[in-house]
Curated annotation (Swiss-Prot):
GO BP, one annotated term: glycogen biosynthetic process
Annotated residues for binding of alpha-D-glucose 1-phosphate: G164, E184, K185, S204
GO molecular function annotations of the record: ATP binding; glucose-1-phosphate adenylyltransferase activity
Protein name listed in UniProt: Glucose-1-phosphate adenylyltransferase
EC nos: 2.7.7.27
Functional pathway: Glycan biosynthesis; glycogen biosynthesis
Family: Belongs to the bacterial/plant glucose-1-phosphate adenylyltransferase family.
Coiled coil: none
Keyword annotations of the record: ATP-binding, Carbohydrate metabolism, Glycogen biosynthesis, Glycogen metabolism, Nucleotide-binding, Nucleotidyltransferase, Transferase
Alphabetized Pfam families for the sequence: Hexapep_GlmU, NTP_transferase
Sequence intervals crossing the membrane: none
Catalysed reactions, as listed in the record: alpha-D-glucose 1-phosphate + ATP + H(+) = ADP-alpha-D-glucose + diphosphate
PROSITE patterns listed in its UniProt record: ADP_GLC_PYROPHOSPH_2
Amino acid sequence: MANRQRVLGIVLAGGQGRRLLPLTADRAKPAVPFGGIYRLIDFVLSNLANAGFLKIVVLTQYKNHSLDRHITTTWRMSTLLGNYVTPVPAQQRVGPRWFSGSADAIFQSLNLVYDEQPDYILVFGADHIYRMDPRQMLEEHIASGASVTVAAVRVPRKDAHAFGVIQPAASGPERGRRVARFLEKPADTEGLGLPDAPDEVFASMGNYCFTTAALLDAVIRDAADERSAHDMGGNIIPMFVERGDAAVYDFHTNQVPGSTPRDHAYWRDVGTLDAYYDAHQDLVSVHPIFNLYNQDWPIYTHHRPLPPAKIVHDGTSVVDSLLSDGVIVADARVSRSVLSPSVYVDRGAVIEGCVLLDNVHIGRGAVVRNAIIDKNVVVPDGAAIGVDPQRDAERFTVSEGGIVVIAKNAVVEP
């Protein structure tokens, strides 16, 4: 049923990602590399494309050059069939101003909706790690009769303070399906537990399915409200909740081809350095919590013409790690790490629990532990990173969890 409807995908990709600094100092948050060869935005675009939703606009704003370049070089659809993935920056169609919120981004881009005339609009975020078949959400939305359906992931009630929390109806024919309340990062979680799991709550995933007319009406009215922050989660969704016109979609029910009980319903918000690091650690075990190797629901990205990874010399050890194309590990030890394209690890180096982005060079005898190193950084021979917390804090960014982060193109002293 879902594929017979006219559906437009709108991906909100204008986020700055301040909590991911310095990784976002030179790029938009959705353009941050992940998992060796991907960008964060590849996950939402792959979910939409795998589901057959091939008319997608990506609303961009903050430091969008690398993001726009990635989309235009990677996500080229067949124009013969009218399909497209198009990055759309703020165009100042309603005056000399940029996007002032996610709802305002849609309001300023309504010409794209009018041109396509869809029956339904999928408004999805651009910076989460997950697999999802959005057709199933659309089908539930149509069956519910609601104007909007909000996708929700189950999280422990004790963690509710970190999320926008959806409280579903606790009784009546809409029990567990209609949204009774929407609370942003509630301090008091008493009574917010789910009807079938009192110790869990629904956290908003930032993914919404709208009936088109309802979304148009909402963003137009919101644009006229000078008191509004013009935010989808903070202003638009509460409009529908207040009048009982919002449904909730339980992400746990989503069935993705090729998924296993271990990675079923995996979803990660990688909005902090520690969360970004932890999500990489989810990739590297023998049976990973998130499996990049599921070819029944592939994650698409741009593949550069690089040679295969190479491991040389008898003394080399690589354990529980991902090696991308162009990587060379020469008589060194690598464990629990993700190495992006063209990383070079020289003789005698030790890499433990690290995320190394493109073109990082690790010198001879260097020791690097629990670190994220951005592109084009040269770690000199004999350097020690992640070994002396005090010296690390003097030279680099250190996350709350103790992860050392080195900015793109940084010069590392011996």
